[in-house]
Amino acid sequence: MKVLGIESSCDETGVAVYDTELSGVPALRAHAVYSQIALHAEYGGVVPELASRDHVRKLLPLIRQTLGEAGLRIDELDGVAYTAGPGLVGALLVGAGVARSLAWALDVPAIGVHHMEGHLLAPLMEDDPPQAPFVALLVSGGHTQLVSVKALGSYQVLGETLDDAAGEAFDKTAKMMGLPYPGGPQLAALAETGTPGRYKFARPMTDRPGLDFSFSGLKTQVLLAWRSSDQSDTTRADIARGFEDAVVDTLAIKCLRALDAAGCDTLVVAGGVGANKRLRARLQEAAQRRGGRVCFPRPALCTDNGAMIAFAGALRLQAGEHADAAVHVTPRWDMAALPPLAAQESGVGNRE
């Protein structure tokens, strides 16, 4: 089954083709992402109306490009998957409208995919994919969640952020210290040159039971440290390192607690912050110490992309699901409300 995936939930236009007749890395026949960073940079954040208009401009050319790279004609597709939520309503409607129109014209099924389920399942596209049950850390600019995955499609949220998401905290902290948009990756790069331990910030909510997160207080700590400093380049790097270490430690501590609570030893990490080098190293070290395993998607599939939507959509289409002809999107959508996935013959992601 060859499935076209379309991602348009925010400021990336992503398109991919996933082929269920293949497995591992080769099953992703082609994927392409267009980022709107340059468009939104002068505003210091995403402008929803501009995002929607840019998706309109870029989506069809990107579909043609991706099909060409996959070596496929459009009439060789067997299904179309699109992000139906959560996200910016206008941006979601662009992708959903194009996907539904293509599916109708080609007489193939379409399926709306939960954006965060796409992220959660992205590591399953790699060689030697993780098998459920496992715990997933979904960590991005808009979400920070710990999810117990008993089987594919069966999700229980164990903990989540009470205020800022981790990626959002990275971006806002970077902006406080004068780094250009988007600040998160810039701050992480700057932290590489910082001196460890010169600035030590709190590890929020790790001194009490529970699996929820809070990063607003940490952000305030950093702001006060920055304002009272000499604001030199060296100090900026040292504060960035202290902030990143605090976030990474907090995420790692909560992940280990979640594994204990769920009674399993496999951790899946996905979302844009999952590409952070220090977070990857810290979680791999922690997993090795407890004799467990941590699984990440390749860095290119950590940020928003069409590949994860094509893959998640393919699994649900194979299970017999499909969307009706109407164009529906859900800007706010609880992943725990998703229907469980029927067991696949391939056994992808589920232990026997």
Swiss-Prot record:
Its cofactor is Fe(2+). The keyword Iron applies. It comes from Xanthomonas axonopodis pv. citri (strain 306). Belongs to the KAE1 / TsaD family. Required for the formation of a threonylcarbamoyl group on adenosine at position 37 (t(6)A37) in tRNAs that read codons beginning with adenine. Is involved in the transfer of the threonylcarbamoyl moiety of threonylcarbamoyl-AMP (TC-AMP) to the N6 group of A37, together with TsaE and TsaB. TsaD likely plays a direct catalytic role in this reaction. Keywords: Acyltransferase, Cytoplasm, Iron, Metal-binding, Transferase, tRNA processing. Fe cation binds at residues 115, 119, 304. It is found in: Cytoplasm. Substrate binds at residues 138-142, 171, 184, 276. HAMAP family: TsaD. This is tRNA N6-adenosine threonylcarbamoyltransferase.
